[in-house]
């Protein structure tokens, strides 16, 4: 347990930031899941919008320091490959 005033404050700040980061990650995972579901259904009209949403959420997570930029780049690349495969099929 923290003894100093600043350490006690940091415990509160860390708890708050952790909650915000969990919300951001959850929102991003949901966007990715929605995109994958649309790809599986074969809906070519909505797949572009879903991809933009997922990509935007991933970039926001990178900018806020929630996930590493290489992780986001890898996920975006793999999702983009799936979208392209659907569009050409």
From Swiss-Prot:
Keyword list, A-Z? Ribonucleoprotein, Ribosomal protein, RNA-binding, rRNA-binding
GO molecular-function terms, A-Z:
small ribosomal subunit rRNA binding; structural constituent of ribosome
Q: Identify the GO cellular component terms for this protein.
A: cytosol; small ribosomal subunit
Q: What Gene3D superfamilies is this protein classified in?
A: Ribosomal protein S20
Secretion signal span = none
**Short name of any one Pfam family annotated for the protein:** Ribosomal_S20p
Q: Which domain of life is it from?
A: Bacteria
Return the protein name: Small ribosomal subunit protein bS20
Q: Which gene encodes it?
A: rpsT
């Amino acid at each position: 347990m923290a003894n100093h005033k600043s350490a006690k404050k940091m415990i509160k700040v860390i708890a708050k930031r952790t909650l915000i980061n969990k919300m951001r990650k959850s929102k991003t995972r949901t966007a990715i899941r929605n995109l994958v579901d649309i790809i599986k259904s074969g809906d070519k009209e909505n797949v572009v919008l879903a991809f933009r949403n997922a990509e935007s959420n991933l970039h926001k997570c990178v900018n806020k320091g929630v996930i590493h930029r290489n992780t986001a780049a890898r996920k975006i690349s793999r999702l983009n490959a799936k979208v392209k495969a659907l569009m050409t099929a």
